[in-house]
Amino acid sequence: GVALADAAADLLTQFERQGPVQLRQLLDAARRRGRLAGDPGQAQSALSAAMRADNARKTAAGLRQRFRFVAGRVGLTDWLLDADMRRLEREVVLAVERYREAARRSLVRRIQALPARGIGEIVMILLERIGILELQPVRRPGASGAELLLTGNAPGPVSPVATGFVIRRDGRDVGREQVTELRGSLHHFGPAAAGWIVTTGQVLSGAREEAAAPGASAVRLVDGATLARLCEEHGIAVVNTNVSLPLPDPELFEALRNGNGG
């Protein structure tokens, strides 16, 4: 996973002078430092898979891959950049992350400023994009008019899970009381075995503690910040802009150095 890829990147820094190394050499370094154990063949496969998965995640996020595989060896793409380019790239990534955080805060404010119907529509679109099936409105005695109540089937580990959804459209914070109230009223959501509470406000620590209570029905909590992140990830209510940065083509330069450039 991510931790193993991070460990591999850390270990590879010691090989920069000699360039890309055999996977077995990297595996031996990882085992000496206690980063990997077990069967060597399986450990090597896990290490290789972690680095390739990390590259796939970086590519999906529009970022430079960390690892470069060439002729059965692996190295860091950092080695292709000089010190100034590494520094500038780190600054760009940090600036983009700050921009993303500011954009999410702006998105939350814009959603909060919508009328109740608009908030409900955005959340319903998001739920469908996430994979919630058969969304339907329901009624619950004593429910606030600021709440939109829905049932649907959420993706589960084996089969869809009947779920009750409470969409708080007034922007109020969610506390422990709202979690216990949802659990106690799941029978109003048909055969629901789990619940979601979505708000454009905050989720308080008491609510998170209650939602994590062992042995109780699962309740997922989505606050304003999480709502904005999910909208961003699924392309809801956002327009993406891309900034492309040029990097030297390592394969071309290697071919030219070896006299294979044509």
Locate the predicted segments by residue.
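A positively charged, amphipathic N-terminal helix/segment that binds anionic biomolecules
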Residues: 1-2
